[in-house]
UniProtKB/Swiss-Prot annotation:
A motif ('Ionic lock' involved in activated form stabilization) lies at residues 111-113. It is found in: Membrane; Cell projection, Cilium, Photoreceptor outer segment. The modification N6-(retinylidene)lysine is found at K273. Keywords: Cell projection, Chromophore, Disulfide bond, G-protein coupled receptor, Glycoprotein, Lipoprotein, Membrane, Palmitate, Phosphoprotein, Photoreceptor protein, Receptor, Retinal protein, Sensory transduction, Transducer, Transmembrane, Transmembrane helix, Vision. It comes from Ictalurus punctatus (Channel catfish). The keyword RNA-binding does not apply. This is Rhodopsin.
C-alpha cells in the first residue's frame, strides 16, 4: 500500500496492465450499458429469461465501475495506492461480479432443464420465477463476497500488487482463511458447476430424444436449440475465463510457503476480468431478436 512495486517486475508490465484495464472499460461499459438500454426500450425483450441475462449486465457494470477503474489507476501507479479500504472495495466487487455470473448461469441451466426436459409437468418459467432467480443469485454472491469484509478471511493485494482478491496465500491468525477458502471452493465454485453440468447432461439427452421422437414442432425445437446453445456457450466462456484463476488460487492455497512469482497469479486474475465483456457479446451474436432490436436502437428507430 505504500510505494511502487517495480522491484517485482519491469515498470512496463504495470503500464501494460493499465492499458489492458482501459481497454476493458472502453469495451465493457458501452456493451453492457447497451444490453440494458436495448432490453428496457423494447418491450418484446422483457421476457423472464432475459431478466437473468440483464442481471449479468448489471453485475458486469459493477465490475467495470467498482473494479476496472480502480485497477487501472493502481496499475498506472505501480502499487495499490488506495489503501486497505480501496482493496476491500475492489476485491469485493470483483468477487461479487464473478459469483453473480456463476449463479446466474446456474439459474439459466435450471431454467433450460425445466423447460426442455419437463421434469415438472405444465411448468412455465414466468416473471415471478425470474425474480426469485435474481434474488437467489445476489444472495449467494453476497454470501461469498461479504464475509472477507467482516473478518472471515480478507482481501489483500495479489500478484503484482495492483489488484485485490481473497487471501489464499497466508494462514494469518484471526482470519480463518483456511475454512473460508474451503467453503468458497465447495459452496461457491464446485456446487454451482455440478448443478450446471447435471442440468446440461440431462438437457442433451432430452434434446436427442425429442429430435428422434419429433415430439415438438420443428420451429419450437429450433428456438429451444438456439437458446440452449447460447447458454451453453456462456458456460464454456465462464469456464475458460475463471478456471485458470480458480486453479491457480487452489494451487497456491495448498502450497502455502512455496515461492511464486508475481506474474503467476496476475495473468489468470486479469484474464478472469475479461468475463465482463463476453456474456453481452455472446448474447448479441447469438440472439437474433436482440440483435435486430439493437440495430434498430442504434439507427435511431429506423429499421436496418
Amino acid at each position: 500500500y505504500e510505494y511502487p512495486q517495480y522491484y517485482l517486475v519491469n515498470p512496463a508490465a504495470y503500464a501494460a496492465l493499465g492499458a489492458y484495464m482501459f481497454l476493458l472499460i472502453l469495451v465493457g461499459f458501452p456493451i453492457n450499458f447497451l444490453t440494458l438500454y436495448v432490453t428496457i426500450e423494447h418491450k418484446k425483450l422483457r421476457t423472464p429469461l432475459n431478466y437473468i441475462l440483464l442481471n449479468l449486465a448489471v453485475a458486469n457494470l459493477f465490475m467495470v465501475f467498482g473494479g476496472f477503474t480502480t485497477t487501472m489507476f493502481t496499475s498506472i501507479r505501480g502499487y495499490f495506492v488506495l489503501g486497505h479500504l480501496g482493496c476491500n472495495l475492489e476485491g469485493f466487487f470483483a468477487t461479487l461480479s464473478g459469483e453473480i455470473a456463476l449463479w446466474s448461469l446456474v439459474v439459466l441451466a435450471i431454467e433450460r432443464w425445466v423447460v426442455v426436459c419437463k421434469p415438472i409437468s405444465n411448468f412455465r418459467f414466468g416473471e415471478n420465477h425470474a425474480i426469485m432467480g435474481l434474488a437467489f443469485t445476489w444472495t449467494m454472491a453476497m454470501a461469498c463476497a461479504a464475509p472477507p469484509l467482516v473478518g472471515w478471511s480478507r482481501y489483500i493485494p495479489e500478484g503484482m500488487q495492483c489488484s485485490c482478491g481473497i487471501d489464499y496465500y497466508t494462514r494469518a491468525e484471526g482470519f480463518n482463511n483456511e475454512s473460508f477458502v474451503v467453503y468458497m471452493f465447495t459452496c461457491h465454485f464446485m456446487t454451482p458447476l455440478t448443478i450446471v453440468f447435471f442440468c446440461y447432461g440431462r438437457l442433451l439427452c432430452a434434446v436427442k430424444e425429442a429430435a428422434a421422437a419429433q415430439q415438438e414442432s420443428e420451429t419450437t425445437q429450433r428456438a429451444e436449440r438456439e437458446v440452449t446453445r447460447m447458454v451453453v456457450i456462456m458456460v464454456i466462456a465462464f469456464l475458460i475465463c475463471w478456471c485458470p484463476y480458480a486453479g491457480v488460487a487452489w494451487f497456491i492455497f495448498t502450497h502455502q510457503g512455496s515461492e511464486f512469482g508475481p506474474v503467476f497469479m496476475t495473468i489468470p486474475a486479469f484474464f478472469a476480468k475479461s468475463s465482463s465483456i463476453y456474456n453481452p457479446m455472446i448474447y448479441i451474436c447469438l440472439n437474433k431478436q436482440f440483435r435486430h432490436c439493437m440495430i434498430t436502437t442504434l439507427c435511431c428507430g429506423k429499421k436496418a
